[in-house]
């Protein structure tokens, strides 16, 4: 049955090719395919129509966007004012439109709380945790976590997280939520990605060249240097890094033979994945990494370290090899 659905998110593509919140956009597309009337409430500015959904852009004064809210707020603390303004305006917009049968809030903070609780109490409430938002929630004082959890439960909210690791962490931090939790990785969309041959042709890569690809934010937690050091020990292998971050210049200096492509639009990133012989990840802090799922969906082998749900995935996927750094 078709329903009017509100999707609240602090991350959503503002233009074609924008990688921010692409997994939320995939959720919206799934709702649209099911015949629902979808309204997205997101920070920033852009087109008011996206793939058939109505988008309500809300002022945030630069608080949200790439490379993520926490990084942006840490970089410039005055952006907290913009984050507060987004919460107030999004809550107001939700209150004004009380005809949604269903509200889907992505990111536990600030969308599931406090924004989603300001909508019509008759709306079905679905809350989705993705990663850093869940870990931030788990670090809140116990009394605050309990208060928020009880508010969600009082509304009959259904909670979904994208990995078993996140479910375990959330259940341990707030046991009262355990019975309401489900695990489901975010949908991914690789339908328009070119074949390996076409991707290599577009990127100017010969069929005989072996390419190892790393995709991600260049921060210490991702351990890109560890991955590049391991790749440097292999002969006749071209290493490519897609992504940006504070470690970029030091990595360039340390690994001069590596091609650093920088931060790319999502279609270009997916083209690189399709063209690669292997995707490599040395990050030990992952739940259900989208880039690994995208690579496997495109038939690209993955070498990674044991982290999050990768351990369970590797048991049933011979194309996912886990190694432990020595």
What residue ranges belong to the model's regions?
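Nucleotide-activated donor-binding/catalytic signature segment of Leloir-type glycosyltransferases, i.e.
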Residues: 249-267
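Short hydrophobic beta-strand element within catalytic cores of glycosyltransferases
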Residues: 301-304
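Short alpha-helical donor nucleotide-sugar binding micro-motif in glycosyltransferases
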Residues: 263, 271-276
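Aromatic "clamp/platform" in nucleotide-sugar-dependent glycosyltransferases that forms part
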Residues: 284
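A short helix/loop element that forms part of the nucleotide-sugar donor recognition site in Leloir-type
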Residues: 143, 193-205
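Conserved donor-binding/catalytic core segment of Leloir-type glycosyltransferases
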Residues: 160, 206-222, 228-232
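N-terminal subdomain of nucleotide-sugar transferases
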Residues: 1-57, 232
């Amino acid at each position: 049955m078709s329903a009017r659905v509100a999707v609240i998110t602090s991350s959503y593509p503002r233009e074609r090719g924008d990688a921010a919140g692409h997994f939320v956009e995939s959720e919206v597309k799934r709702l649209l395919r099911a015949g629902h009337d979808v309204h997205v409430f997101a920070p920033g500015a852009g087109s008011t129509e996206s793939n058939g959904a109505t988008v309500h852009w809300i002022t945030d004064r630069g608080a949200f966007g790439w490379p993520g809210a926490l990084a942006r707020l840490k970089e410039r603390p005055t952006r907290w004012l913009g984050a507060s303004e987004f919460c107030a305006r999004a809550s107001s917009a939700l209150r004004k439109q009380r005809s949604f049968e269903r509200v889907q809030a992505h990111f536990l903070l600030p969308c599931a709380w406090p924004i989603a609780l300001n909508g019509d109490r008759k709306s079905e409430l679905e809350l989705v945790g993705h990663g850093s938002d869940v870990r931030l929630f788990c670090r809140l004082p116990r009394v605050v976590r309990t208060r928020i959890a009880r508010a969600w439960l009082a509304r009959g909210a259904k909670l979904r997280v994208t990995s078993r690791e996140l479910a375990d962490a959330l259940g341990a931090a707030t046991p009262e939520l355990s019975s309401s939790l489900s695990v489901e990785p975010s949908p991914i969309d690789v339908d328009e990605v070119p074949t390996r041959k076409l991707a290599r042709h577009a990127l100017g890569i010969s069929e005989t060249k072996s390419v190892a690809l790393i995709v991600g934010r260049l921060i210490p937690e991702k351990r890109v240097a560890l991955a590049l050091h391991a790749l440097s020990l292999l002969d006749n292998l071209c290493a490519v890094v897609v992504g940006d971050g504070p470690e970029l210049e030091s990595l360039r200096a340390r690994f001069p033979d590596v091609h650093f492509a920088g931060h790319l639009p999502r279609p270009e990133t997916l083209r690189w994945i399709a063209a690669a012989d292997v995707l490599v990840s040395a990050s030990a802090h992952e739940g259900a990494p989208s880039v690994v799922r995208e690579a496997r969906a495109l038939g690209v082998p993955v070498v990674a370290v044991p982290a999050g749900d990768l351990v369970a995935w590797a048991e049933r996927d011979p194309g996912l090899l886990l190694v432990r750094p020595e």
